[in-house]
Amino acid sequence: MKPENKIPVLTRLSDEMTAVVNFQQPGLPPWPADGDIETQRQYYLLERRFWNADAPSMTTRTCVVPTPYGDVTTRLYSPQPTSQATLYYLHGGGFILGNLDTHDRIMRLLARYTGCTVIGIDYSLSPQARYPQAIEETVAVCSYFSQHADEYSLNVEKIGFAGDSAGAMLALASALWLRDKHIRCGNVIAILLWYGLYGLQDSVSRRLFGGAWDGLTREDLDMYEKAYLRNEDDRESPWYCLFNNDLTRDVPPCFIASAEFDPLIDDSRLLHQTLQAHQQPCEYKMYPGTLHAFLHYSRMMTIADDALQDGARFFMARMKTPR
């Protein structure tokens, strides 16, 4: 599709989103578009420091977990001494960027709003680690904490998964992996999904949206996919193209959030409509005037904080509902 035919989303954003797009951090260099991936990772970490500031204070603990691929670092956020459930968080970043620090504020706010222990998983990034390593590392982390719950004062009878963007795919894929492989790490009471991609190769929204402002052009999306997958056959795997999995049964309750001008919004719409058609518990909410990744910007956007609180409320409601 010719770029000129795309919707001019920058003229349609909310005032809050526009303020974020126009915000310039003092002393921050331009994005290293032609830099190597490690340079881009360091830039992303530097750029996110401002957005992670002024986060709620709470007890945190770092735990290095052994997995079949080697050690994986996790961070436990405990807003109170005891917790009614444990929520595992998978960060976004196109499978190639991000870590526990780039999403620290998001996890702290989720812990505060749910009152539960949130465990961030610093899964191995692509292209150094290819599908399905991040999923298998996540499952190994869940298994570890289910076996060491007392040591960390965790309640693992009720667990959940959460993630944004690529992390949302990993969150849902990990829950389906547990179901499909008959691995028990606790009762998965909910999955919180913010603007994820779930396997579509093309869609109306991917044609109409996406540009330099969000790093989600068609070329960008192809690059992320090629970095993550081992080969083209993986595109059809039921834990990458989640629409090739069985979504008609035993899918944990899903909170599905999308951004209005996100090229990935059709993934969320299709996921919601599929689950709804098969009577799988789910809730869908679109946040008007927003771009992909808006969850990061709660320091300037009340709607980002609203989206986190909406997910937290969904999770807390499922804590009280027997499954």
UniProtKB/Swiss-Prot annotation:
NCBIfam families: PRK10162.1. Keywords: Cytoplasm, Hydrolase, Serine esterase. One of its GO terms (cellular component) is cytoplasm. Its main location: cytoplasm. Displays esterase activity towards short chain fatty esters (acyl chain length of up to 8 carbons). Able to hydrolyze triacetylglycerol (triacetin) and tributyrylglycerol (tributyrin), but not trioleylglycerol (triolein) or cholesterol oleate. Negatively regulates MalT activity by antagonizing maltotriose binding. Inhibits MelA galactosidase activity. Homodimer. Interacts with MalT and MelA. It holds the Pfam family Abhydrolase_3. Belongs to the 'GDXG' lipolytic enzyme family. Its EC number is 3.1.1.-. The active site is at S165, D262, H292. It comes from the Bacteria. This is Acetyl esterase. It is found in: Cytoplasm. GO terms for molecular function: carboxylic ester hydrolase activity. Coiled coil: none annotated. A motif (Involved in the stabilization of the negatively charged intermediate by the formation of the oxyanion hole) lies at residues 91-93.
